[in-house]
């Protein structure tokens, strides 16, 4: 069966540049990746074709040879026998090249000599109250993670034995092989890039050097921390494989909405409803603040809806600072409901006694509107 044209496989023109090739490959690889299409042989075949096409076209020399000779340029002395295919670990190498940054830097970059691998970073979501954000706290959390195996001390080898250098790659984790007119390097298919093999695996961790366990950790939440803040606990992530360094644990904080207060940076806002008569005649009321005290607010007569009163220093603490924000009281005026007959009579009498000076805003507004429409 004749091979499909590499350009057609990727859905690009022969004049496509490197950026267009990479973009086309990324979209197709994500669509047909085996993890998204388990047990789908057609998707697996398509994924291999996509990888093969991109491997050839991304290299200027290989692309030039293909443009000139077609598939014939790679049909002699290719890997895996006759067809110049991608036997062994080639697909993962290409996939890491494109998606390395998306997948934490790629496996090859996570490994060091001796097959050691850095552990994965972990994420833990924590929700706290506004009061806890105000005062700070120390929280105890339990995190399921991988820790270093205590039987083999992370080596992955059965006690009394040691890992050995891979005979295929001589401990380098990479092998070179001829493909057509070219010689390319790829991950060793025997040790999968680790450079070592474990003849006698540890009975507890089965050669991984780590086991799954739930750990208890203490997390310090500083006063003033905001919603969406990320706290990094270095070395508290997943244990590294075969003695590699541990990853980090990231605590992602969210602050619960408060019943009375809304936060904006270090400032707090509280909407307080007062009666119509209090707004007209003036008065006082107390508000509870997050520091556990009460503050008295004096409302002058004639206070309008939306009026703000500032309580200096009654807001949130500024993170890692001695400064604090302010608390703003926003006045809302409540219109009375379910009036008695006598209350209605008094309000009607009040309305009759009112003058333009009592309601300058509404009087002025309707006067301007009348002038606007009548000219």
UniProtKB/Swiss-Prot annotation:
Designated name of the protein: Chaperone protein DnaJ
Positions annotated to bind Zn(2+) 2: 166, 169, 188, 191
Binding site for Zn(2+) 1: 149, 152, 202, 205
Record's keyword annotation contains Chaperone: yes
HAMAP family from the UniProt entry: DnaJ
Transmembrane segments: none
Pfam families, per the entry: DnaJ, DnaJ_C, DnaJ_CXXCXGXG
The J domain, residue ranges: 5-70
Keywords, comma-separated and alphabetical: Chaperone, Cytoplasm, DNA replication, Metal-binding, Repeat, Stress response, Zinc, Zinc-finger
SMART domains linked: DnaJ (SM00271)
Annotated cofactor note: Binds 2 Zn(2+) ions per monomer.
GO annotation terms (biological process): chaperone cofactor-dependent protein refolding; DNA replication; protein refolding; response to heat
Organism listed in the record: Rhizobium johnstonii (strain DSM 114642 / LMG 32736 / 3841) (Rhizobium leguminosarum bv. viciae)
Compartments where located: Cytoplasm
Gene3D superfamilies attached to this UniProt entry: DnaJ domain (1.10.287.110), Heat shock protein DnaJ, cysteine-rich domain (2.10.230.10), Urease metallochaperone UreE, N-terminal domain (2.60.260.20)
Any GO CC annotation of this UniProt entry: cytoplasm
Residue intervals of every CR-type zinc finger in the record: 136-214
């Amino acid at each position: 069966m004749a091979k499909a044209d590499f350009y057609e496989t990727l859905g690009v023109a022969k004049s496509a540049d490197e950026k267009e090739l990479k973009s086309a490959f990324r979209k197709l690889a994500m669509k047909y990746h085996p993890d998204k299409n388990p047990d789908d042989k057609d998707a697996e075949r398509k994924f291999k074709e996509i990888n093969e096409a991109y491997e050839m076209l991304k290299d200027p020399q290989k692309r030039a040879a293909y443009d000139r000779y077609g598939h014939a340029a790679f049909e002699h002395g290719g890997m895996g026998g006759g067809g110049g295919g991608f036997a062994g670990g080639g697909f993962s190498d290409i996939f890491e090249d494109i998606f390395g940054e998306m997948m934490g830097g790629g496996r090859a970059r996570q490994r060091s000599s001796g097959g050691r691998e850095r552990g994965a970073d972990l994420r833990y979501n924590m929700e706290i109250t506004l009061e806890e954000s105000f005062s700070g706290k120390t929280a105890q959390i339990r995190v399921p993670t991988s820790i270093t195996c205590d039987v083999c001390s992370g080596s992955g080898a059965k006690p009394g034995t040691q890992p050995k250098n891979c005979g295929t790659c001589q401990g380098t984790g990479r092998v070179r092989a001829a493909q057509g007119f070219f010689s390319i390097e790829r991950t060793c298919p025997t040790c999968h890039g680790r450079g070592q093999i474990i003849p006698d695996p540890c009975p507890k961790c089965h050669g991984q050097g780590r086991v799954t366990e739930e750990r208890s950790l203490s997390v310090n939440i500083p006063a003033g921390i905001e919603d969406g803040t990320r706290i990094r606990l270095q070395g508290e992530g997943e244990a590294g494989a075969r003695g590699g360094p541990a990853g980090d644990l990231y605590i992602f904080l969210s602050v619960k909405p408060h019943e009375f207060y809304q936060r904006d940076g270090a400032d707090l806002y509280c909407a307080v409803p007062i009666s119509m008569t209090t707004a007209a005649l003036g008065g006082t009321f107390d508000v509870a603040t997050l520091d556990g005290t009460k503050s008295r607010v004096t409302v002058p007569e004639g206070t309008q809806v939306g009026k703000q009163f500032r309580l200096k220093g009654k807001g949130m603490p500024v993170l890692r600072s001695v400064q604090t924000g302010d608390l703003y009281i926003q006045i809302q005026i409540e219109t009375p409901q379910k009036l008695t007959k006598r209350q209605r009579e008094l309000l009607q009498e009040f309305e009759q006694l009112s003058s333009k000076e009592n309601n300058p805003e509404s009087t002025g507004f309707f006067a301007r509107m009348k002038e606007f429409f009548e000219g």
